[in-house]
């Protein structure tokens, strides 16, 4: 090679721009593809003072990031709003109100601003069960809106949007019946990003209200849209909406988003009411019942089943918590009817008392098994026998989704119980208490080689990924937190009950061990 050529090559190399740091896509619920993983992100392993802290109105949607902006939704002064913040400084950039509509009825622990937005390079898309779909550009200018009827839901709408090519996928499961039918009005739709028009719509008449976000499963055989629902998991063609396969056996309440890896699909759901094991210990339920034993005789009398009585579903919670259990109706006539039905269920000898022995003998957990399953690709019709690789029925979370990383699945359940499962065969690698008790609503997420867990009381636990449990850090946020965190290159963003916090590492932090 000539001297001139060498000089030219050297000059060319010198003039090439430095390689840009990778952009961490976290533009939808649980990040890119809903995986819950930001492999190249470098947030701090130990959380200290936040880089910034911004006040936010109430809401349960998770933050998403695109174009240097962070987006979320909230309910403020009785109005649904979409908010944008500067990622670097936390400064509010804009806030847009949705049309003024009656708000859907939600559970006391829920919010009409629960569904997480979805963003792309130029727009942000939001869904409110009370209104429908809205699309804004990154400056807050409305691009289109699509009003929709509010589905009838047991707790309020909570599903989040996902993207497939140039469409948005939205699951509208519904407790309302079709006219003149006992089938439900449930459906899944694909909406064009460009104008909000319907690309396709598929009925789901066999399922009722649910709270899970769907997922796209990409494997060697193609792409599938995976939609959990009450009692079953269903696969559709994401281009047309045609059903491909299903597997039954899930509980009435499906909340967790499916994930994939190791050539398989993983889906989970706890038993109705949140029970994590197939045969839960009845003793905590009886101890919770005794909180209504006014005369402290060790039995529950019919007369003690007052208007304040609540049958426990989550006995670890205090009775005043909205998630504790099933209260009696406020209407006196309905309350007396329910009281008689409920009491007669266990009072087999008719003496108007529940004893411990009666309670234990008649407490039934037949509301769908808690399940974590692995499905192999390639099935059609019912695939339970043909494609089920393995199944686990213990320590299944009620709300948080599993996260997959390096051939392992991680699940966090209420009480702060972290479970790690081998994704290949379903074998338990460990189950450990992280030392941060309480309920868990936020899904576990991974950045680099670290797992970030957020408890409802507001404690963040950082755990090293791997076959053995290793707690790296715990940090008390100082207020409750119910929302899955988000990441950029060096930051973990956490929404608490009233603030948005950014915990940022130095940009030149060292390499993360994988």
List each model region and its residues.
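Bacterial N-terminal signal peptides
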Residues: 4-15
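Noncatalytic, solvent-exposed loop/strand surfaces
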Residues: 18-514
């Amino acid at each position: 090679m000539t001297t001139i050529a060498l000089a030219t090559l050297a000059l060319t190399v010198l003039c090439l721009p430095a390689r840009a740091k990778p952009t961490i896509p976290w533009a939808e619920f649980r990040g890119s593809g809903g995986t819950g993983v930001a492999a190249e992100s470098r947030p701090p392993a130990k959380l200290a003072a936040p880089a910034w802290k911004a006040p936010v109105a109430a809401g349960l949607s998770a933050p998403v990031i695109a174009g240097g902006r962070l987006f979320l939704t909230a309910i403020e002064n009785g109005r649904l709003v979409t908010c944008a913040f500067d990622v670097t400084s936390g400064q509010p950039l804009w806030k847009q109100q949705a049309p003024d509509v009656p708000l859907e009825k939600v559970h006391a622990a829920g919010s009409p601003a629960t569904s997480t937005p979805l963003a792309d390079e130029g727009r942000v898309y939001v869904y409110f069960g009370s209104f429908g779909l809205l699309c804004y550009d990154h400056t807050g200018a409305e691009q289109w809106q699509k009003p929709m009827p509010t589905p009838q839901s047991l707790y309020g709408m909570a599903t989040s949007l996902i993207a497939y090519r140039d469409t948005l996928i939205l699951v509208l499961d519904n407790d309302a019946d079709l006219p003149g039918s006992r089938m439900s009005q449930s459906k899944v739709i694909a909406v064009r990003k460009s104008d909000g028009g319907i690309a396709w719509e598929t009925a789901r008449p066999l399922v009722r209200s649910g709270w899970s976000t769907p997922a796209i499963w990409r494997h060697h055989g193609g792409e599938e849209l995976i939609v959990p629902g009450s009692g079953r998991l269903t696969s559709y063609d994401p281009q047309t909406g045609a059903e491909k396969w299903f597997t039954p056996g899930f509980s009435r309440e499906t909340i967790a988003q499916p994930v994939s890896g190791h050539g398989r699909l993983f889906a989970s759901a706890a038993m109705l009411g949140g029970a994590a094991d197939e045969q839960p210990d009845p003793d905590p339920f009886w101890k919770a019942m005794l909180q209504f034993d006014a005369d402290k005789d060790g039995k529950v009398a019919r007369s003690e089943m007052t208007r304040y009585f609540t049958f426990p579903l989550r006995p670890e919670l205090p009775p005043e918590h909205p998630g504790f259990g099933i209260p009696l109706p406020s209407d006196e006539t309905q309350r007396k009817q329910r009281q008689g039905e409920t009491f007669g269920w266990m009072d087999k000898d008719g003496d108007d008392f529940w004893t411990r022995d009666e309670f234990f003998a008649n407490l039934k957990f037949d509301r769908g098994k808690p399940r974590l399953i692995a499905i192999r690709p390639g099935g059609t019709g019912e695939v339970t026998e043909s494609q089920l690789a393995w199944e686990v029925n213990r320590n299944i979370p009620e709300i948080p989704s599993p996260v997959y990383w390096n051939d392992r699945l991680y699940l966090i359940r209420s009480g702060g119980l972290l479970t790690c499962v081998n994704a290949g065969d379903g074998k338990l690698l460990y189950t450990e208490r992280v030392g941060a008790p309480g309920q868990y609503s936020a899904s576990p997420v991974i950045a680099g080689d670290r797992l970030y867990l957020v408890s409802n009381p507001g404690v963040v636990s950082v755990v090293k990924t791997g076959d053995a449990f290793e707690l790296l850090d715990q940090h008390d946020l100082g207020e409750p937190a119910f929302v899955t965190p988000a990441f950029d290159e060096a930051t973990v963003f956490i929404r608490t009950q009233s603030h948005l916090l950014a915990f940022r590492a130095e940009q030149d932090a060292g390499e993360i061990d994988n």
